[in-house]
Amino acid sequence: VDGEQLEAAHQALREAVADCQRAGKRTLVLGGGHETAFGHGAGVLDAFPGEKVGIINLDAHLDLRFADCASSGTPFRQLALECDAQQRGFHYTCIGVSRAANTQALWDEAARRQVAIVEDLEVLTAFETRVLPELERNIAQFDRLYLTIDLDVLPAREMPAVSAPAALGVPLGTLLRIVEPLCRSGKLQAVDLVEFNPLFDIDGQGARAAARVAWQIAHWWR
């Protein structure tokens, strides 16, 4: 796709992902912005029309924004509308959400859509009682899982290479504790890593962190 034709890019990614998934493959998509998640997620939904797909987003932001044009803030609202159009459930879990980085309208939409949320503070202070049960629920309840990781969920000190670095965030070691059981579940069908921006990186620090996450996913994925 040439230029800034986001809808065409979404459709091209959607078709490529659906083709791969129908061929028995899994998909790992790298960047750019979180708008990538709509094309990737829609392709997974298209490939498994009769199955329950759980969407797990590791992110400081809910990305359920109302907007006339698609952007990195709209992908999960777009996926919710896609699920509505396909007359299927929208099963969305967001882990690492910053209470300070989302408007009340986004919290209201999340409540209306019955989004399962684990805030960043809960990840840091109640991992065993809030995060692990949510992961276990997703693994038990859904036929397929789609994991999307916005790198701005990491603290700014570990991931400077994003447009909205997190003041608090979920540390890399903790993030990997979330990722590992999903990778080993046998249900993880698709993963993406998004929002890395090399223009904001410091001495390659963010690139190395992102590469380690990608390596661990490939290493653990069953």
From Swiss-Prot:
Q: Which Gene3D superfamilies match?
A: Ureohydrolase domain
What does the note under cofactor report?
A: Binds 2 manganese ions per subunit.
Q: Name one GO biological process term.
A: L-histidine catabolic process to glutamate and formate
**Which InterPro entries does the record cross-reference, listed alphabetically?**
Ureohydrolase, Ureohydrolase_dom_sf, Ureohydrolase_Mn_BS
Q: Pathway involvement? A: Amino-acid degradation; L-histidine degradation into L-glutamate; L-glutamate from N-formimidoyl-L-glutamate (hydrolase route): step 1/1
Keyword terms, alphabetized: Histidine metabolism, Hydrolase, Manganese, Metal-binding
Q: What is its EC number?
A: 3.5.3.8
- SUPFAM superfamilies xrefs: Arginase/deacetylase
Organism source for this protein?
Answer: Klebsiella aerogenes
Binding of Mn(2+) 2 occurs at D59, H61, D150, D152
Role summary: Catalyzes the conversion of N-formimidoyl-L-glutamate to L-glutamate and formamide.
Which residues are recorded as binding Mn(2+) 1? H34, D59, D63, D150
Gene responsible for this protein: hutG
- What terms describe the molecular function in GO for this protein? agmatinase activity; formimidoylglutamase activity; metal ion binding
Q: Which family is this sequence assigned to?
A: Belongs to the arginase family.
Catalytic activities: N-formimidoyl-L-glutamate + H2O = formamide + L-glutamate
PROSITE patterns, per database record: ARGINASE_1, ARGINASE_2
Name of this protein: Formimidoylglutamase
Which cofactors?
Answer: Mn(2+)
Superkingdom in the source lineage: Bacteria
